[in-house]
Each structure stands twice: as structure tokens, then as C-alpha cells.
Amino acid sequence: QQHKAIHSFPTRRSSDLYEQGVRSSFSQWRVGEANAYLRSDHVAADFVDTFTPEYSAKALCLVSPAWDEEASRETKLEKIITQKWIACYPEGCEAWAEQRRTGYPRLFPVLVNKSNGKIDTRTMIRRLNFPVSIISGNPAQYSALCEYLGGPDTGGTRLWWDTGVNFRD
């Protein structure tokens, strides 16, 4: 609902819906009261690898939990989706779908990409490959699926709904 609120004319303030969503998540996971968290202006910290400093990385997600009614629409969307990602993270596939759909939250980049160029380091894996049971068990179906996919059967090929307009520099 809060996602819809910033893209239309809501009957309730988007801040109310945002805070309601965070409070619901806190309640669902029984992690206490959300008030202090919702007032927090803390942002993600840089990752510092003390053993291999070249693996250290600057934080990319720089939005805090505190709602700012004066923030840009895009910043509000980033806050909403980041909180949604946190809330649905235990359901990894759902969290991954949200991140692919919106580009939020902004995640640390892959530092060692072993995909032989099949997966973009910045946008990460976009889909899972078709299972071996289809590839070997029904080659005609596999060929048809690859044709409908519109690209190779790799983790870097975008799905029909994954338009690529969801990543910002």
C-alpha cells in the first residue's frame, strides 16, 4: 500500500502507511517496539575487510529508516522497498524478486564474478537456469523455453518483466 501511495493520490499519508508496514514487520518477527528504529537516521555502514582490504566496499544504500516527507519520490520509494526487503528477507525468493524488480535496496557489488561474463557484476543474477531435468529430459521444450526467454539460459538473461530501468548510477 505504501508503494502505491507515493505513485498515486493516497487517502492516507505515505508516512503513515510506511510506519504501519514497519510496525507490522516488527510485530510479526517479535523484535520489540519500532519507534526508535523509525526515528533513526542511521544508514548502512561501509564493509571493511580487515584481512583482505581490497574486498572492502563503500555502502551503497544510504537511506535511513526515518521518513522524510520532503524527500524525493525516488528516495521515498527506496526507503519503502528497503524496508519491504528487510521484512521479507526470511523469504529469500520474495526479497530477491523485489530487489530485481526495483533495484532496491542497493546492495554491495560482487567483487569476484566467476560467471565468465554471463552475469553482470552490477546488476547481479537475474534468474535461475532451467533445471537439468528439462534440458536433458525434454530437449524440444528446452529449445522452446530458450526461444521464449529471448536470450541464453544463463543467470544474466532478464525475464520479461525485468525491464532494466530499475538501476540507477
Predicted regions and their residues:
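Extended, well-ordered alpha-helical scaffold segments
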Residues: 13-23
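C-terminal functional modules
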Residues: 26-169
